[in-house]
Design a protein with these regions (language model features):
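Class I (Rossmann-like) S-adenosyl-L-methionine-dependent methyltransferase catalytic domain
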Residues: 1-106, 123-127, 131-206
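A conserved beta-strand element that flanks and buttresses the S-adenosyl-L-methionine
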Residues: 112
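A short His-aromatic
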Residues: 118-120
């Protein structure tokens, strides 16, 4: 696989594989169930979904429990994560690819990206926004670190690996057919169902 940015190679390599061990387990699944029940409370009729940057499928596990029978697809850049993802959804529906190399051949009721845009180089974000929009049949859920203006911060000792900004606002500016339906915040110190200080935005394509 050939990469266009340093960030893609970073997540496809050993760091991305190590990430798997830090992000799994029943506690995370419970938090994800709570998260998606809240974030998707305004959504109706979700029968299919695609997740951009799904890792081993912890988000999709929760969505499958909340929406039994959902037709779930995913894109994942890391080979080991993509292999494990094939235990959660049918392997044929796992796209082992960089998001920048993915061209949606169809649309899904729900398009999801959670904790991924923050790790993509800002110069290629417009390309990612366009792919998210193209894949979106009705709902787009963006769940990321939020900052009103773009900022880069160190990530586990690495520079240029974590970027905060108003991702959802930029997507809606670029694609006015998307309208904000709901939004909220998930706090890392929540006593019951913590998440990693994620601000989420549910948009609907109209």
């Amino acid at each position: 696989m050939t990469f266009k940015t340093e960030q893609e190679a970073f997540w496809a390599g050993d760091f991305g594989t190590e990430y798997i061990q830090r992000n799994q387990g029943d506690a995370l699944l419970a938090s994800n169930l709570d998260f998606f029940a809240k974030a998707l409370r305004q959504a109706r009729g979700i029968r299919s979904c695609i997740e951009f940057g799904a890792n081993i499928g912890m988000n999709l596990k929760a969505l499958k429990l909340l929406h039994p029978g959902i037709d779930a697809h995913a894109i994942e850049i890391n080979a080991e994560a993509a292999r494990q993802l094939g235990d959660v959804i049918p392997p044929a529906q796992v796209h082992h690819s960089s998001i920048l190399d993915f061209s949606p051949a169809r649309q899904w009721d729900l398009t999801l990206i959670k904790g991924v845009l923050i790790h993509i180089h800002p110069e290629v974000l417009p390309q990612v926004y366009d792919r998210l929009f193209a894949a979106c049949g009705r709902y787009l859920l963006v769940a990321e670190y939020y900052n009103p203006s773009p900022v880069a911060i160190a990530y586990r000792g690495h520079s240029d690996r974590l970027f905060k900004r108003d991702f959802a606002g930029e997507i809606m500016d670029r694609h006015p057919q998307l309208q904000l339906l709901d939004y909220g915040f998930a706090y890392r110190r929540d006593p019951n169902f913590p998440q990693d200080d994620i601000t989420w935005f549910l948009m609907e394509k109209r």
